[in-house]
Amino acid sequence: EKYYRPLASGKKYGCFGLTEPNAGSDAAGQQTTAVKEGDHYVLNGSKIFITNSGFSDIFVVFAMTDKSKGTKGISAFIIEKGMPGFTIGNDIPRMGIRAASNCELAFDNVIVPAENLIGREGEGFKIAMATLDGGRIGVAAIALGIAQGAINETIKYVGERKQFGKTIGSFQNTKFKLAELQAKVDAARLL
């Protein structure tokens, strides 16, 4: 309730912190740790390329609570902007998706109340994968749109560019290549 209503109403923004500098997309390679001490956890480590982190208020962060259990030792926590020891780095420049900030997050002995554990200890990997599965369809849709846009621009270009006295779009080989590309995009759209 404390976090859901502000997020659902748009009064606060949230993000999802899984990727780490030394683990990349290998969630099992997490090095961020959360050690339970009484009624709280102490979080140490870092995350990188965390989408929307530059303006978020609430962060779902994944950390190892038991390294001996591999992915079953990963837990999920709610971290609030401004918690002592929690810092948000500068936006990381990248080639695409520039509308969203992507920053590094650093945790230096961040005290996280035990009530900020999402689910139970060891359920973090399952939570992360369920979240990623939902987001992957969006990434696929973006990629499909980019591919279609590239084909549309190519069609314009081959209709204007001349070689040997005629547009290169009039050559049979060019038509075959464009038809093949369009067929692949259409097939992807039907998935």
What kind of region is each of these model predictions?
Residues 40, 44-88:
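A short core secondary-structure module
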Residues 26-44:
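Cytochrome P450 C-terminal beta-domain/meander region
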Residues 76, 86-187:
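Glycine-rich beta->alpha junctions and the first turn(s) of the following alpha-helix
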Residues 22-25, 49-52, 66-68, 94-101:
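Short Gly/Pro-enriched turn/cap motifs at secondary-structure boundaries
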Residues 16, 34, 43-45, 61, ...:
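Buried hydrophobic positions in well-ordered alpha/beta secondary-structure cores of metabolic enzymes
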Residues 1-10, 51-58, 70, 137:
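Internal helix-loop-helix
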Residues 1, 24-27:
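N-terminal glycine-rich flavin-associated loop
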Residues 1-20, 36-39:
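FAD-binding glycine-rich core of flavoenzymes that anchor FAD
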